[in-house]
């Protein structure tokens, strides 16, 4: 059985992000990828988002956080909306839409959110363009966030909290740490 992997290579990650921005421009698909990479939300939670979850129509600005009850765990979480996400969502012209509209609407079924399968196809198309291995899926966005946070020295306890994991073992498995990652630590530490 294959396991979904994070996107570890920065070069491939940049190619992956570039696909819907430059190669096959689509602001919705680009925003989906950027939001997934930068929030560590599960795709099931991303697809349930509405415009009002990210945009304050009274203040005419982005909300500071996405406040959500995770579908899988039932836990409440607050996710900061960083500049990358704000820029990607800005191209979607949210202010001209209804607050209750799906943030990532289906083009095929008007009024409905994007399906999980369609989100998978969007991600897979960008992954193929970037030359990524076959084990890339919707969950890779969430895992990629954790992997790169870990590489930037975010403490494992913080990642456990972000992911709402009950044990470090789950988080460790999630990050996809392999022998190459361990080798880099030994190469980097020179006492």
Spans of features found by a protein language model:
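Conserved catalytic core of the tyrosine transesterase superfamily
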Residues: 1-191
């Amino acid at each position: 059985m294959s396991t979904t992997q994070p996107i570890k290579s920065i070069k491939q990650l940049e190619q992956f992000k570039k696909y819907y921005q430059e190669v096959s421009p689509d602001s919705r698909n680009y925003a989906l990828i950027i939001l997934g990479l930068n929030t560590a939300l599960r795709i099931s939670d991303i697809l349930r988002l509405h415009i009002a979850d990210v945009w304050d129509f009274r203040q005419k600005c982005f909300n500071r956080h996405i406040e959500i009850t995770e579908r899988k765990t039932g836990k409440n979480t607050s996710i900061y909306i960083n500049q990358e996400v704000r820029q990607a969502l800005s191209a979607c012209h949210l202010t001209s839409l209804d607050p209750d509209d799906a943030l990532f609407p289906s083009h095929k079924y008007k009024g409905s959110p994007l399906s999980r399968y369609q989100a998978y196809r969007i991600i897979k198309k960008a992954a193929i363009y970037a030359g990524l291995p076959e084990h890339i899926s919707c969950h890779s966005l969430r895992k990629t966030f954790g992997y790169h946070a870990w590489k930037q020295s975010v403490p494992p306890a913080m990642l456990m909290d972000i992911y709402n994991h009950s044990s470090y073992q789950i988080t460790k498995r999630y990050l996809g740490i392999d022998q190459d990652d361990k080798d880099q630590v030994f190469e980097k530490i020179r006492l």
